[in-house]
Amino acid sequence: GMFDTLLKEDQIITAVRFPIPKRAAYMKFPNPASRYAIVGVLVAETPSGVRVAVTGAASCVFRAQTMEVALENEFTADAIALLTLDSTEFNEDIHASAEYRGHLVNVMARRAVSAII
């Protein structure tokens, strides 16, 4: 969950390395008052493959692996247009229902792909 790691009590992180993506884009649907992402999606083409990371939709950031697989096969917005994510565990509040957040994940992912092709 949030603020948890797999580190043991006597361990410490000494470095974090992120591969430089070949191309990437981040799109968010902001809350109109705070500008925080109701849903945000990063799509990146890295040396080890396509990565799709989602924030705001669930209790913590997660990878949308079904989208990653689809984009590996065809890197176009159309390749993920018909995909739906299981939104049963998504956040739900006065700003967006879980189902709407699921819809926003797809929309923001398609916009991110379109921005980098």
Task: List the predicted regions and their residue ranges.
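C-terminal structural segment of proteins
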Residues: 1-117
